[in-house]
A protein has these predicted regions:
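A short, well-structured edge-of-sheet supersecondary motif
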Residues: 14-47, 78, 285
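Active-site SXXK
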Residues: 38, 52-82, 165-169, 219
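Active-site helix/loop module of the DD-peptidase/beta-lactamase fold
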Residues: 71-118, 144, 172-211
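Short, charged, amphipathic alpha-helices and their helix-cap/turn boundaries
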Residues: 34, 39, 126-151, 175-194
Length: 287
């Protein structure tokens, strides 16, 4: 002890720092951006490169739907809303052999798709499940996969809903969802370099989007600043609040050992046990 304080051996400190450094390096972290009160700190950030966002791409789909609603886009004279049903638009592009699914698909609304409450039982359409399926046949694959539960009653996380929203959007408005997102979000954020390959002729919606680290950070700023970027309102504040408010509890997604255990879902966002709003993707993507 010295002056009432315990003196730590500098060699022990150096050893601990070395162990921590090696541990962090083994995690293969590409970048961490932290923003608070308008200030951004960057860690592990070495160079700009396109990085796959995995399921964080779903955020862009939810944002795009909100923009489309706020713009007043309409179908056959009826404005697009959360209660708009998708079946009238997608029925003619799919060969639904599983007839027990039809009545449930007829009930699907935009809101059901945004909250993963379409009636599926479990996760499906992840890359490992569809790698051998013709991407032009994915609409048929999704709509013929058994839907055992009532629509709007049960959360089951999967990649179907963002994809179906993308298909619906393109068929309803004759525009690929990626192009709409580019015009209404990316260009306004000065996102110039990105990659989002189609599933067949449709934007995947759920995954497959590549952005630079700093551009991914801009998407987070839209959430943090209620739709604003550089003092410009890119997405309405009301829609961002809607996206980030809990729509239903998600007991099937809760895992207590996680840093952010999921207790509820918004529109392709999650709410943690401690009230944090976030979106995650496989292999450690968080926003």
């Amino acid at each position: 002890l010295k002056g009432g304080f315990k003196v730590i051996n500098i060699e022990d400190v150096t050893k601990s720092i070395d162990i921590l450094s090696k541990t962090l390096q083994s995690l293969n972290i590409d970048s961490i951006f932290i923003e608070q009160n308008g200030k951004t700190e960057k860690y592990f950030y070495k160079e700009e490169q396109l990085h796959e966002l995995r399921s964080c791409a779903k955020l862009l789909v939810a944002m795009a739907i909100g923009i489309a609603i706020d713009k007043g886009l309409s179908i056959a004279g009826e404005p697009l809303t959360l209660n708009t049903k998708v079946f009238p638009i997608i029925k003619d592009i799919a060969n639904i052999i599983n007839k027990s699914n039809i009545n449930k698909i007829k009930e699907w609304t935009i809101k059901d798709l945004l909250t993963h409450t379409t009636g599926y039982e479990t996760q499906m359409m992840s890359e490992r499940f569809i790698q051998d399926i013709d991407k032009d046949k994915l609409v048929d694959y999704a709509l013929n996969y058994d839907i055992p539960y009532e629509v709007g009653t049960r959360f089951a996380y999967n990649n179907v809903e963002p994809f179906i929203l993308s298909v619906f959007f393109q068929e309803a408005f004759n525009q690929n969802l990626t192009d709409f997102i580019n015009e209404n979000i990316f260009k306004k954020l000065n996102v110039l370099d990105y990659k989002w390959e189609n599933y067949g002729k449709y934007c995947p919606g759920a995954t497959g989007l590549y952005l630079k680290h700093s551009d991914f950070h801009k998407i987070g700023q839209l959430l943090l600043n209620e739709g604003k970027y550089d003092n410009n309102q890119i997405i309405s504040s009301n829609w961002i609040k809607e996206m980030c408010s809990m729509k239903l509890e998600t007991p099937s997604a809760y895992k207590s050992e996680r840093v952010l255990p999921k207790i509820g879902i918004g529109y392709f966002t999650f709410i943690s046990r401690d009230g944090y709003i976030f979106r995650d993707g496989s292999n450690g993507q968080y926003i």
